[in-house]
Curated annotation (Swiss-Prot):
Cofactor(s) this protein requires: Mg(2+)
Gene for this chain: glmU
Record organism: Allorhizobium ampelinum (strain ATCC BAA-846 / DSM 112012 / S4)
Renumbered residue ranges of the record's region N-acetyltransferase: 253-452
Name listed for the protein in its UniProt record: Bifunctional protein GlmU
Region (Pyrophosphorylase): 1-231
């Protein structure tokens, strides 16, 4: 789109209903602050400049909103005198001469570029105001969009609506696009002759019509326009976001056995032919390549899973876990900041942290990389085709060469050369009849003490 546009994002609310120590727009949806979701939609709508109207937590909100591709200028709203007043807080930016002014809200993280582009297209068609609306079966509480002959003639708040107007199911979302050349003049004409003494952006529709201009409404899915005022609504928005993203991934070739139990982050990348079993949680920063399987009850964050690898069930991949092709991290295993080579197997009950494990190496059950000395972390390096016996403790920093064999139960504190066998435990002793003596002694103690 060749037209210039300024997005004015309203994010100055006190968030009192959220009952939180931080602004509601900083609360995460799928691991990303609400305001950042809105900004992603703005950036994808051919908009580069943003006037961010902020109040509490101004610096934090501005930082969260400053995503790549956007130039964000904050404007602090010191008084709360309505939406019209909030937009005028960015007067300096509005005066720069943009073709379009798009007003949106920082607490509506489900918005997509579609409705925003549609509103801008309506301005390009010669309209002065384009209001984004939605149809709903439950319009109670919303302002109604009153349309005659295809033009929007008014936005009627429910308390002011007639019985006939209350039957209208096309409702105001609060988002709108305004002719940039007329924006400051129109905003300056909004009055506050109402019960609250506030300046309402919705008055612009009747103002522009009184001046001979045109207003229209464009439609959008109700779910995309959901705002968030409290924790219950935040949970609903999270649910809607997850449902939408799961659906997109399944249509792209990802299999989910029980999709309603899979929880994704804003940046989760799952390739075609990935299989996700029930009750899997993805934190931020996870990429899973084609043909990989994530078994049930696994948790992944900041991890990469290569083609054909398997994870879980009941596995945890922490930031820096990088699984090679065909590798396996099995049940009750935790991997953190570790490179796992192609075909390597970590099947059971193991902690691997700050480590490099070569291709085709086998890590036995109960193996622990002892990476922390109480102050610093240290690295464990294991070569290709090595075998680490069960219940081994590898005390870092330590290097185990290609093809080396670590006997079960060993505590390894020194480097092990390639193809060497290392045993780090006491030799087994057999003492005939000793068990019988111990048993008889214990029974005598028990009888003497009177304990059963």
């Amino acid at each position: 789109m060749s037209r210039t546009c300024l997005a004015v994002i309203l994010a100055a609310g006190d968030s009192t209903r959220m009952k939180s120590a931080m602004s509601k727009v900083l609360h995460p949806v799928a691991g990303l602050p609400m305001i950042a979701h809105v900004m992603q939609a703005i950036a994808a709508s051919d908009i580069a400049d943003v006037a961010l109207v902020v109040g509490r937590d101004a610096d934090k909100v501005t930082k969260a909103a400053s995503i790549k591709g956007l130039s964000v200028t904050p404007f602090v709203q010191t008084e709360r005198l309505g939406t019209g007043h909030a937009v005028l807080t960015a007067r300096e930016a509005l005066a720069r001469g943009y073709d379009d002014i798009l007003v949106a809200y920082g607490d509506a993280p489900l918005i997509t570029p579609g409705p925003l582009l549609a509103a801008r297209a309506a301005l390009a068609d010669g309209n002065d105001i384009a209001v984004i609306g939605f149809h709903t079966e439950k319009p109670t509480g919303y302002g109604r969009l009153l349309v005659e002959d295809g033009e929007l003639v008014a936005i009627r708040e429910e308390k002011d609506a007639s019985d006939e107007e209350r039957k209208v199911t096309w409702c105001n979302s609060g988002l709108m696009a305004i002719n940039g050349a007329k924006a400051l003049d129109l905003l300056g004409r909004i009055g506050n002759a109402n019960a609250k003494g506030e300046y309402y952006l919705t008055d612009l529709v009747e103002i522009i019509r009184s001046l001979g201009g045109k207003a229209v409404a464009v439609d959008a899915p109700e779910a995309e326009l959901a705002g968030c005022n409290n924790r219950a609504e935040l949970a609903v928005i999270e649910k809607l976001w997850q449902e939408r993203r799961r659906h997109e991934l399944m249509l792209s070739g990802v299999s989910m056995i029980a999709p309603e139990t899979v929880f994704l982050a804003y940046d989760t990348v799952l390739a075609q032919d990935v299989l996700i079993e029930p009750n899997v949680v993805f934190g931020p920063g996870v990429t899973v390549e084609s043909g990989a399987v994530i078994h049930a009850f696994s948790h992944l964050e900041g991890a990469h899973v290569a083609s054909g690898a398997t994870v879980g069930p009941f596995a945890r991949l922490r930031p820096g876990a990088n699984l090679g092709e065909g590798s396996k991290v099995g049940n009750f295993c935790e991997v953190k900041k570790a490179e796992i080579g192609a075909g390597a197997k970590i099947n059971h009950l193991t902690y691997i942290g700050d480590a490099f494990i070569g291709a085709e190496t086998n890590i036995g059950a109960g193996t622990i990389t002892c990476n922390y000395d109480g102050v610093n972390k240290h690295e464990t390096r294991i070569g290709a085709n090595a075998f680490i016996g069960s219940n081994s403790a590898l005390v870092a920093p330590v290097t185990i060469g290609d093809g080396a064999f670590i006997a079960s139960g060993s505590v390894i504190t020194d480097d092990v050369p390639a193809d060497a066998l290392a045993l780090g435990r006491a030799r087994q002793e057999i003492k005939p009849e000793r068990a019988k003596i111990i048993r008889e002694r214990n029974m005598a103690i028990k009888a003497f003490s009177g304990k059963v």
